[in-house]
């Protein structure tokens, strides 16, 4: 019997367009490889609690948002997850959704549930009845086009661009006979007959699919998920455009493109799949409703996080370190990155006169930077912010200018040689003829025990120079935000961080997220120069910040892969500080050795700290460092309340003294910038662990770079976003425990609430428990827990213990 087409509803273009816009904003952005940063994969779901997000992502992605039940059951059996934790999680859940007893929750943890299943697309239904993988075929054809369209210089033949993504795809698809060869007769003609505008094409496809306006948003979200990283890359373009007050349609164009594929497949397979497709449409229309299992999973996840918070309470309840009143011999400011914590702990253990502090690694300088001998502008600041000043490393002296020209010529020659190596007519011949020439270099690179040392760029400078008033305002704002207003040591290091790895497409993800995926050396050197400026220092005295004449600021770079620290003391030569610098280098070397020994215990095949540097140069090493795996806490408090405590490299540490923050402007900055950045990092690790197929980048061993923008697994397919599996798993067990971040701030909880009320999007992270929030008392103890909707409750604390506990 011939099935009739689904009824064609009357559609409102504005309503459908708005549904596409909402679906687009439910997708997280994906930054290109050159500046990749961690992104919260649940960015579009932070306005709803975990159970509701579970229902949504099950429908559109077939993805879990929590671990398998066995994971929780194992922790209950081991005692790690106690009855106290389970009871507290039950009490915190909405009354209508929680089990009645702890025993019921434990029984539920023993029952494994079916994996989530997404609603089907037409391509999936066509695959099921035809025996041909239309789902994979559509993904492959769109990927083949997208890799050329979004290319950033890797492709040797440029793809047609067109005025927008839809127009460019349409131009390509009308000449692509591959679908016809594989049986989709008339595809090119269908595309040619489609409207020229993406909006009109989308309406046409939706009508042909028989979708209602009510079904559109979920269906559009489903289509974007089916495109993997390509949809996220398009979302990145919209993100960047909106930062500059513009817009971009690539992500909604992708919805139209993917819908055209489905409508064409429905025309071919409608007699076989009409009933199933009608059922799917009805599923897309249904209001989202979490299941009982969704609520139980959310409660179990909350319980595990409460268990971790209980351990952290014990660590912080240990007696605080006394705050020395004498002048320190050395102060060193680090990025808040969790990898800084072990190094800071090791460095402070060497001498009581050493003080460290934590601050966002861009050090309050929102710069667009041009490196020496380069015209490429790098946004070295959090991706949440637009650059406000420009800087460069060229033009200091005639010698620098000559060197700049020479390096530019060398760089152009290197690029030309590289393109020749990749060219279709020469690539194989190149390997045959030139391979032996590279033997010595390959052996040298592979056998070198340490990291490659490169000559530093000249000291960066503001370009154009900032007026004195702007320099003073910037210096004051940064020092107050760092809670660094005195006393000052004779030597103050400002240390950014970066990573030294080879053969790693995701190398920028190991650099500083607060610097937009670049190393933090430029920002550190800029701030050191600003604070060494005599005019700035004189003006700061009038603002109650007196920097002693014998204090020298020096920029530095902490290599998180090797724990070596580079000092840029040549930027500001000071013979008077030669002895202090020599002593500091000794301290840094010793602290680096201690930190490497600690890290070696966690890294596979790194029996000693000495193996760490060799790993950085190993082409085959998929785990040169663990990066931010294990991150679980963000603490903003005076350093004495965290110093001496073993936080296992799992806490972001931000120095903050609310008593100096009279208007709570620094508290506002912390809650709206570094806390949000840390949440993106934490939730990227969380998503890549609980649902690696959806939110992870797959297997590093299979990665190939495409378009200079991202990676695919193998020879093609969808762009992969998120973290590779090797970043969260050591081959035998998880090294990242998927826990939502606990944010601890030493400040009056009333002040925290006032700021959250001004920023609904930040408050939503806490109201919906994507983050946990605690206010610390004046002794650094977890005193208040935020319970949502502006409410707080007293947090139970263990008795004060003189012994310093471990976070493990």
From Swiss-Prot:
Q: Where are the transmembrane segments?
A: none
Q: Name one GO cellular component term.
A: plasma membrane
State the superkingdom.
Bacteria
Required cofactor(s) = Zn(2+)
**Which compartment or compartments is the protein found in?**
Cell inner membrane
Q: Which InterPro entries match?
A: DabA
User: Where would you say this protein principally sits, based on its record?
Assistant: membrane
> What are the GO MF terms of this UniProt record?
zinc ion binding
As for membrane topology, the entry says: Peripheral membrane protein
Tell me which residues bind Zn(2+).
Answer: 335, 337, 497, 512
Q: Which UniProt keywords apply?
A: Cell inner membrane, Cell membrane, Membrane, Metal-binding, Transport, Zinc
Q: How does it assemble?
A: Forms a complex with DabB.
PANTHER family in the cross-refs: INORGANIC CARBON TRANSPORTER SUBUNIT DABA-RELATED, UPF0753 PROTEIN AQ_863
Biological role stated in the UniProt entry: Part of an energy-coupled inorganic carbon pump.
The entry's family comment says: Belongs to the inorganic carbon transporter (TC 9.A.2) DabA family.
Q: Which protein, by its recorded name, is this?
A: Probable inorganic carbon transporter subunit DabA
Source organism (scientific name): Rhodopseudomonas palustris (strain ATCC BAA-98 / CGA009)
Task: Tell me the organism's taxonomic lineage.
Answer: Bacteria, Pseudomonadati, Pseudomonadota, Alphaproteobacteria, Hyphomicrobiales
């Amino acid at each position: 019997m011939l099935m009739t087409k689904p009824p064609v509803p009357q559609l409102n273009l504005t309503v459908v367009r708005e549904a596409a816009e909402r679906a687009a904003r439910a997708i997280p952005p994906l930054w290109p490889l050159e500046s990749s940063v961690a992104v919260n994969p649940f960015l579009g779901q932070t306005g709803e609690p975990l159970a509701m997000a579970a229902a949504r992502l099950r429908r559109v992605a077939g993805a879990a948002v929590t671990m398998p039940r066995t994971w929780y059951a194992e922790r209950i059996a081991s005692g790690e997850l106690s009855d106290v934790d389970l009871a507290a999680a039950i009490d915190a859940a909405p009354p209508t959704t929680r089990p009645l007893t702890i025993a019921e929750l434990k029984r539920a943890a023993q029952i494994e549930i079916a994996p989530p299943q997404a609603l089907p697309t037409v391509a999936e239904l066509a695959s099921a009845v035809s025996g041909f993988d239309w789902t994979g075929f559509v993904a492959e054809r769109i990927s083949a086009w997208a890799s050329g369209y979004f290319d950033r210089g890797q492709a040797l033949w440029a793809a047609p661009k067109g005025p927008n993504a839809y127009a460019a795809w349409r131009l390509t698809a009308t000449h692509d006979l591959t679908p016809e060869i594989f049986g989709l007769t008339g595809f090119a003609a269908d595309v040619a007959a489609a409207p020229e505008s993406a909006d009109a094409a989308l309406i046409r496809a939706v009508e042909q699919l028989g979708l209602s306006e009510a079904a559109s948003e979920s269906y559009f979200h489903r289509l974007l998920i089916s495109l993997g990283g390509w949809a996220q890359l398009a979302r990145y373009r919209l993100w960047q455009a909106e930062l500059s007050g513009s817009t971009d349609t690539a992500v909604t164009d992708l919805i139209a493109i993917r819908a055209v594929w489905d409508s064409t497949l429905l025309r071919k397979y409608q007699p076989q799949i009409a009933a199933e497709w009608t059922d799917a449409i009805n599923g897309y229309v249904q209001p989202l409703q979490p299941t009982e299992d969704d609520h139980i999973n959310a409660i179990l996840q909350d319980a595990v996080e409460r268990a971790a918070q209980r351990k952290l309470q014990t660590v912080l309840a240990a007696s605080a370190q006394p705050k020395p009143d004498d002048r320190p011999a050395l102060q060193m400011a680090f990025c808040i990155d969790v990898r800084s914590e072990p190094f800071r702990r090791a460095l402070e253990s060497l001498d009581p006169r050493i003080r460290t502090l934590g601050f966002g690694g861009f050090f309050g300088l929102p710069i667009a930077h041009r490196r020496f001998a380069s015209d490429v502008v790098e946004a070295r600041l959090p991706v949440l912010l637009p650059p406000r000043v420009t800087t460069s490393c060229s033009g200091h002296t005639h010698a620098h200018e000559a060197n700049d020209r020479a390096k530019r010529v060398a760089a152009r020659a290197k690029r030309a040689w590289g393109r020749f190596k990749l060219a279709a007519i020469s690539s194989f011949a190149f390997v045959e003829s030139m391979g032996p020439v590279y033997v010595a270099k390959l052996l040298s690179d592979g056998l070198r025990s340490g990291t490659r040392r490169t000559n530093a760029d000249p000291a960066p400078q503001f370009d154009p120079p900032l007026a004195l008033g702007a320099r003073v305002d910037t210096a004051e704002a940064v020092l107050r935000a760092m809670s660094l207003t005195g006393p000052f040591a004779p030597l103050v290091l400002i240390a950014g961080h970066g990573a030294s790895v080879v053969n790693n497409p995701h190398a920028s993800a190991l650099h500083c997220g607060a610097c937009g995926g670049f190393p933090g050396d430029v920002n550190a050197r800029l701030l050191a120069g600003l604070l060494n400026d005599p005019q700035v220092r004189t003006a700061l005295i009038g603002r109650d910040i007196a920097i002693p004449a014998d204090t020298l600021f020096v920029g530095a770079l902490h290599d998180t892969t090797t724990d070596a620290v580079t000092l840029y003391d040549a930027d500001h030569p000071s013979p008077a500080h030669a002895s202090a610098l020599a002593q500091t280098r000794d301290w840094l070397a010793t602290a680096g050795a201690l930190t490497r020994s600690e890290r070696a215990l966690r890294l596979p095949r790194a029996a000693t700290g000495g193996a760490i540097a060799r790993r950085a140069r190993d082409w085959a090493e998929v785990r040169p460092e663990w990066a931010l795996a294990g991150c679980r806490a963000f603490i903003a408090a005076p350093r004495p309340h965290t110093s001496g405590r073993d936080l296992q490299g799992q806490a972001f540490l931000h120095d903050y003294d609310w008593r100096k923050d009279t208007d709570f402007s620094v508290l506002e900055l912390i809650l709206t910038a570094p806390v949000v950045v840390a949440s993106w990092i934490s939730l990227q690790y969380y998503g890549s662990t609980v649902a690696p197929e959806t939110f992870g980048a797959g297997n590093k061993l299979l990665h190939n770079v495409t378009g200079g923008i991202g990676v695919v697994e193998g020879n093609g397919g969808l762009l992969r976003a998120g973290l590779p599996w090797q970043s969260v798993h050591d081959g035998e067990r998880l090294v990242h425990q998927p826990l939502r971040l606990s944010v601890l701030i030493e400040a009056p909880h009333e002040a925290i609430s006032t700021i959250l009320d001004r920023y609904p999007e930040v408050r939503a992270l806490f109201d919906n428990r994507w983050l946990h929030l605690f206010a610390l008392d004046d002794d650094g103890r977890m005193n208040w827990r935020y319970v949502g909707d502006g409410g707080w409750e007293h947090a139970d604390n263990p008795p004060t213990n003189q012994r310093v506990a471990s976070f493990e």
